[in-house]
Amino acid sequence: MTQHTHIATLHTNHGAIKLNLFGNEAPVTVANFVDLANGTKTGKPFYNGVIFHRIIDGFMIQGGDPTGTGRGGPGYDFNDEPHDDLHFHTPYKLAMANAGKKFDGSGTNGSQFFITVVPTEFLWGKHTVFGEVADDVSKKVVDAIAQVATDRDDRPNDDVEIVSVDIEAV
């Protein structure tokens, strides 16, 4: 059974999303997320003011790009951390967004992440699951965000902003 090592709370302009992070199963990914959220890697909290730039109702919400375009990141990449205990069998999984593998086989994870709203097992092995939505109130916030109006490129018509992120070790 997976035990969470941290709780991250994303304070958005649509409400708070509490996330359980699985640092034992995905230690590099969780450390990266925590360090970005706290500002340890960048000198200031990386996710504050960043938007969910891609929202697809019935699939997922994606954020973590400081440019808001889907092309930005922290300036470095790291490899996937697939784990047999972390799958997409159920909705509300937190995972790293990436651009697939580089020619040399290395990963393209950086700062972008997504939260699923349905089971998405076809993503396993392509994206590192490193957490899940922690409670029903947070799930309702995720569901509400997933249903905001978007343009044909899945960008919200009105910004869905991550105002701040709190991290708590457990």
Regions found by a protein language model. Give the residues of each.
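Cyclophilin-like peptidyl-prolyl cis-trans isomerases
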Residues: 1-170
